Amino acid sequence: MQMRMTRNMELQKNKVLLGLSGGVDSATAALLLKEKGYDVTGFYFDVMGGNENGRAEAEVVAAQIGIPLIYENVSEDFHRVVIENFVSEYRCGRTPNPCIICNPNIKFRRLLRHADEIGASYIATGHYCRILYDEANDAYYIRRAANDKKDQSYMLYRLGQDVLSRLIFPLGEFLSKEETREIARKSHLSNAEKKDSQEICFID
């Protein structure tokens, strides 16, 4: 099987919608895309509704980078699709992973929808992951990030071809989180030293 890395940022000059959380990973991903000539728009989706702090952080970062930001309250669908499943699994004695449910059903669905609305050819996130393209089968596959300690490919295995064929992971080749932070520092981003989130996104 002949496989090659796809989404070569040096060759692509298209509009992209990037999931912007307000954290350093997605902010750095936006910076990298802009440096490569992409026309970047940020997208912040509020999973619980009324998360003014999270929204404000995303707005500050978007302003610092110089990109527009789209906001959407997805709390109703998130509760129905993700939280209800989470509670049900716990009641059955299983340990659920809400990201595995959210990514294909909420996060990337919304990214694609808004990308189409603004005419963006691609979507992107700050995940540590890579994509491979199999020419023989004309199919895209998730690949582990170069940084094994930060790899997030296991949370994205349920994404379909409609998503993978338009998806860019700017941080996939990074070997350490320090590389990410250093880029943010050089650009004087306010979130350059922001700690990584260790909690489930809907549990404070």
Language model: regions and residue ranges:
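Internal nucleotide-binding/catalytic subdomain
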Residues: 159-204
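ATP-dependent adenylation/nucleotidyltransferase module used to activate substrates
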Residues: 3-158, 168, 176-186
